[in-house]
Design a protein with these regions (language model features):
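Short, small-residue-biased leader/transition segments that mark boundaries at the very start
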Residues: 1-5
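A contiguous, surface-oriented mixed alpha/beta subdomain in the mid-to-C-terminal portion of proteins
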Residues: 16-184
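Terminal low-complexity "docking" segments
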Residues: 8-18
Protein backbone atom coordinates (compact mmCIF):
# COMPACT_ATOMS: atom_id res chain seq x y z
CA UNK A 1 0.00 0.00 0.00
CA UNK A 2 2.89 2.35 0.65
CA UNK A 3 3.92 2.31 -3.01
CA UNK A 4 0.40 3.14 -4.11
CA UNK A 5 0.26 6.07 -1.68
CA UNK A 6 3.66 7.41 -2.79
CA UNK A 7 2.67 7.15 -6.44
CA UNK A 8 -0.49 9.14 -5.76
CA UNK A 9 1.15 11.68 -3.50
CA UNK A 10 2.58 13.86 -6.26
CA UNK A 11 2.25 17.61 -5.94
CA UNK A 12 -0.33 17.95 -8.73
CA UNK A 13 -2.55 15.20 -7.34
CA UNK A 14 -2.27 16.54 -3.79
CA UNK A 15 -4.11 19.65 -4.87
CA UNK A 16 -7.12 17.81 -6.29
CA UNK A 17 -7.63 14.37 -4.76
CA UNK A 18 -9.50 14.23 -1.47
CA UNK A 19 -8.46 11.82 1.25
CA UNK A 20 -11.66 9.88 0.65
CA UNK A 21 -10.73 9.40 -3.00
CA UNK A 22 -7.18 8.44 -2.05
CA UNK A 23 -8.55 5.83 0.34
CA UNK A 24 -10.92 4.54 -2.35
CA UNK A 25 -8.02 4.29 -4.81
CA UNK A 26 -5.97 2.33 -2.28
CA UNK A 27 -8.94 0.08 -1.51
CA UNK A 28 -9.58 -0.77 -5.16
CA UNK A 29 -5.91 -1.21 -6.02
CA UNK A 30 -5.41 -3.58 -3.10
CA UNK A 31 -8.58 -5.55 -3.88
CA UNK A 32 -7.68 -5.87 -7.57
CA UNK A 33 -4.41 -7.56 -6.56
CA UNK A 34 -6.35 -10.42 -4.97
CA UNK A 35 -5.06 -13.84 -5.94
CA UNK A 36 -8.54 -14.91 -7.07
CA UNK A 37 -9.19 -13.52 -10.56
CA UNK A 38 -12.97 -13.49 -10.06
CA UNK A 39 -12.69 -11.39 -6.89
CA UNK A 40 -10.16 -9.05 -8.51
CA UNK A 41 -12.44 -8.66 -11.55
CA UNK A 42 -15.42 -7.93 -9.28
CA UNK A 43 -13.61 -5.04 -7.63
CA UNK A 44 -12.40 -3.74 -10.97
CA UNK A 45 -15.98 -3.87 -12.28
CA UNK A 46 -17.13 -1.75 -9.34
CA UNK A 47 -14.27 0.71 -9.85
CA UNK A 48 -15.08 1.01 -13.55
CA UNK A 49 -18.82 1.45 -12.97
CA UNK A 50 -18.19 4.19 -10.42
CA UNK A 51 -15.64 5.93 -12.64
CA UNK A 52 -17.82 5.86 -15.77
CA UNK A 53 -20.84 7.21 -13.89
CA UNK A 54 -18.64 9.86 -12.25
CA UNK A 55 -17.25 10.91 -15.63
CA UNK A 56 -20.73 11.17 -17.14
CA UNK A 57 -21.88 13.31 -14.21
CA UNK A 58 -18.78 15.52 -14.47
CA UNK A 59 -19.40 16.02 -18.17
CA UNK A 60 -23.05 16.88 -17.51
CA UNK A 61 -22.21 19.56 -14.93
CA UNK A 62 -19.00 20.88 -16.50
CA UNK A 63 -16.51 19.54 -13.95
CA UNK A 64 -13.03 18.35 -14.87
CA UNK A 65 -13.47 14.58 -14.71
CA UNK A 66 -9.75 13.99 -14.22
CA UNK A 67 -10.10 15.39 -10.70
CA UNK A 68 -12.76 12.87 -9.70
CA UNK A 69 -11.69 9.59 -11.32
CA UNK A 70 -10.29 7.07 -8.84
CA UNK A 71 -7.61 4.46 -9.47
CA UNK A 72 -4.97 3.86 -12.09
CA UNK A 73 -6.22 1.01 -14.25
CA UNK A 74 -6.41 1.34 -18.03
CA UNK A 75 -10.07 2.35 -18.02
CA UNK A 76 -9.52 5.06 -15.40
CA UNK A 77 -6.64 6.48 -17.45
CA UNK A 78 -8.73 6.44 -20.65
CA UNK A 79 -11.58 8.23 -18.90
CA UNK A 80 -9.21 10.88 -17.50
CA UNK A 81 -7.60 11.67 -20.85
CA UNK A 82 -10.31 11.17 -23.47
CA UNK A 83 -12.87 13.74 -24.57
CA UNK A 84 -14.73 11.24 -26.76
CA UNK A 85 -18.38 10.52 -26.03
CA UNK A 86 -17.44 6.98 -24.96
CA UNK A 87 -14.31 8.20 -23.12
CA UNK A 88 -12.15 6.30 -25.59
CA UNK A 89 -13.38 3.01 -24.20
CA UNK A 90 -14.96 1.79 -27.43
CA UNK A 91 -15.69 -1.92 -27.18
CA UNK A 92 -13.36 -2.51 -24.21
CA UNK A 93 -16.23 -1.95 -21.74
CA UNK A 94 -19.13 -4.09 -22.94
CA UNK A 95 -21.54 -2.61 -20.39
CA UNK A 96 -20.80 1.04 -21.33
CA UNK A 97 -24.05 1.59 -23.31
CA UNK A 98 -26.05 0.27 -20.37
CA UNK A 99 -24.17 2.55 -17.97
CA UNK A 100 -24.87 5.51 -20.25
CA UNK A 101 -28.60 4.69 -20.10
CA UNK A 102 -28.43 4.28 -16.33
CA UNK A 103 -26.75 7.68 -16.00
CA UNK A 104 -29.74 9.28 -17.72
CA UNK A 105 -32.11 7.95 -15.04
CA UNK A 106 -33.29 10.83 -12.84
CA UNK A 107 -34.90 8.72 -10.09
CA UNK A 108 -31.99 7.80 -7.81
CA UNK A 109 -33.61 4.66 -6.40
CA UNK A 110 -34.40 3.34 -9.89
CA UNK A 111 -30.85 4.23 -10.90
CA UNK A 112 -29.35 2.31 -7.96
CA UNK A 113 -31.53 -0.70 -8.74
CA UNK A 114 -30.36 -0.67 -12.35
CA UNK A 115 -26.74 -0.55 -11.21
CA UNK A 116 -27.36 -3.52 -8.93
CA UNK A 117 -29.08 -5.39 -11.78
CA UNK A 118 -26.02 -4.76 -13.97
CA UNK A 119 -23.79 -6.15 -11.22
CA UNK A 120 -26.16 -9.09 -10.67
CA UNK A 121 -26.02 -9.94 -14.38
CA UNK A 122 -22.22 -9.75 -14.29
CA UNK A 123 -22.18 -12.14 -11.33
CA UNK A 124 -24.48 -14.56 -13.17
CA UNK A 125 -22.44 -14.38 -16.37
CA UNK A 126 -19.16 -14.97 -14.54
CA UNK A 127 -20.33 -17.87 -12.37
CA UNK A 128 -22.58 -19.73 -14.82
CA UNK A 129 -20.14 -22.61 -15.35
CA UNK A 130 -18.70 -22.53 -11.82
CA UNK A 131 -21.52 -24.15 -9.86
CA UNK A 132 -19.36 -25.73 -7.15
CA UNK A 133 -16.51 -23.20 -7.12
CA UNK A 134 -15.73 -20.59 -4.48
CA UNK A 135 -16.68 -17.93 -7.03
CA UNK A 136 -20.31 -19.05 -6.86
CA UNK A 137 -20.25 -18.84 -3.07
CA UNK A 138 -18.80 -15.32 -3.25
CA UNK A 139 -21.39 -14.32 -5.88
CA UNK A 140 -24.15 -15.71 -3.67
CA UNK A 141 -22.88 -13.62 -0.75
CA UNK A 142 -22.76 -10.50 -2.93
CA UNK A 143 -26.29 -11.12 -4.17
CA UNK A 144 -27.52 -11.59 -0.60
CA UNK A 145 -25.93 -8.26 0.33
CA UNK A 146 -27.75 -6.59 -2.56
CA UNK A 147 -31.04 -8.15 -1.50
CA UNK A 148 -30.49 -7.17 2.12
CA UNK A 149 -29.88 -3.59 1.04
CA UNK A 150 -33.14 -3.47 -0.92
CA UNK A 151 -35.21 -5.32 1.67
CA UNK A 152 -34.82 -2.35 3.99
CA UNK A 153 -36.15 -0.08 1.26
CA UNK A 154 -38.97 -2.31 0.03
CA UNK A 155 -39.75 -5.29 2.24
CA UNK A 156 -42.36 -7.00 0.02
CA UNK A 157 -40.24 -6.82 -3.11
CA UNK A 158 -37.09 -7.84 -1.25
CA UNK A 159 -38.78 -10.94 0.14
CA UNK A 160 -40.08 -11.88 -3.32
CA UNK A 161 -36.60 -11.42 -4.83
CA UNK A 162 -35.07 -13.48 -2.04
CA UNK A 163 -37.54 -16.32 -2.63
CA UNK A 164 -36.85 -16.19 -6.37
CA UNK A 165 -33.11 -16.37 -5.69
CA UNK A 166 -33.49 -19.34 -3.37
CA UNK A 167 -35.78 -21.07 -5.90
CA UNK A 168 -33.31 -20.46 -8.72
CA UNK A 169 -30.45 -21.78 -6.61
CA UNK A 170 -32.42 -24.92 -5.70
CA UNK A 171 -33.23 -25.52 -9.35
CA UNK A 172 -29.63 -24.82 -10.39
CA UNK A 173 -28.15 -27.13 -7.77
CA UNK A 174 -30.60 -29.92 -8.68
CA UNK A 175 -29.69 -29.58 -12.36
CA UNK A 176 -25.98 -29.48 -11.55
CA UNK A 177 -26.29 -32.57 -9.34
CA UNK A 178 -28.13 -34.48 -12.07
CA UNK A 179 -25.49 -33.49 -14.63
CA UNK A 180 -22.73 -34.49 -12.22
CA UNK A 181 -24.36 -37.89 -11.71
CA UNK A 182 -24.78 -38.42 -15.48
CA UNK A 183 -21.14 -37.55 -16.14
CA UNK A 184 -19.69 -39.64 -13.33
CA UNK A 185 -21.79 -42.81 -13.46
CA UNK A 186 -20.24 -45.28 -15.85
Amino acid sequence: LGDVYKRQDTKSEKEYISWEDRLAALYYEYAMKCGNKFVADWFELNLNINNVLTAITCRKYGFDKANYIVGHNEIAENIRTSNARDFGLGDSVEYLPELQRIAEETDLIVREKKIDLLKWKWLDDNTFFKTFDIESVFAYLLKLEMIERWVTLDKARGEKTFRELVGAMKMGSENALEEFKRNNIK
